[in-house]
Amino acid sequence: IQIREEKNDWMVWLIYAVLTILIFYCMDTPNIFGRAEAGDHFHAHAYYNSVYNVYQGLPYTDTLTSIYGHYGLLFKIPMKLVGGDFRMFVLMIAGLGTLAHVCAFLVLELTVESRILRVLGAVAAAFPVLGMRGGYYWQVWPHRMIFPMILLLYAAILMKKQWWNVWSGLAGYLICLLAILWNTETGVILAVAWMALFVSRCLAGGEWRIGLLIRTVLVHAVCVAASFFGAYGIVNLYNLSKHSPANTLGE
């Protein structure tokens, strides 16, 4: 896999566009009883309820903390703008799911030379959502996919432009902080992966010294911890603003 230089692959871009429209259409499914499957309305209710709680200003407690993360905080302002409307919330979810796929298509465009492989990769990425038309599993799409795709696209752009510096690294950890806030386990994995990317670059940079490697590992370990505790702090600032005790790490 190499960074591709040729442009104007209009047929590939047309396929991206068609898939993007189909993905949005498939994910915009506000009728949670449409397939008459209990899992659909259970999944939809669980996800929306945790967002609606934050919209109403409820603090996170041991009984109200969502098992999927604290994504409700990132939905709070958009939900205020639409008055907590469920129909508009589904549109937001469809938009996020579509954005995750667009990021995946752009990663393919930046990193894969073969047109056939790019098309096959795009179809494969879209297949899970297109294959469950009318179904609900927001807990995976877009929930556990949006930030991995954003970070992967960001890394691909850095590779394309060779923008490797302190600030680009910190921007990656900012994305990881938001990812941890959104969904804890996914965000922590992304932060560790972002650290591993810089460590691997250190090892691949020709001659390297053990001192440089140790310093790189330590600096990025601190950044991973800062991403985690930054997200933890944001949750507790929200709780304190609602006159509720701070959450423990266990909560």
Question: Where are the language model's segments positioned?
Answer:
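Membrane-interface micro-motifs in multi-pass membrane enzymes
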Residues: 116-159, 182
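Hydrophobic, membrane-inserted alpha-helices
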Residues: 74-76, 101-102, 125-129, 171-177
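Transmembrane-helix signature of membrane-embedded glycosylation machinery that interfaces
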Residues: 92-95, 104-113, 155, 159
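Transmembrane catalytic cores of multi-pass membrane glycosyltransferases
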Residues: 23-72, 80-96, 103, 126-129, ...
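Specific aromatic-rich, kink-prone transmembrane helix
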Residues: 143-163, 172-176, 195-201
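Start-transfer (signal-anchor) and selected internal transmembrane alpha helices
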Residues: 1-28, 219
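Membrane-interface helix-boundary motifs at transmembrane edges
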Residues: 2-8, 108-116, 160-167, 205-213
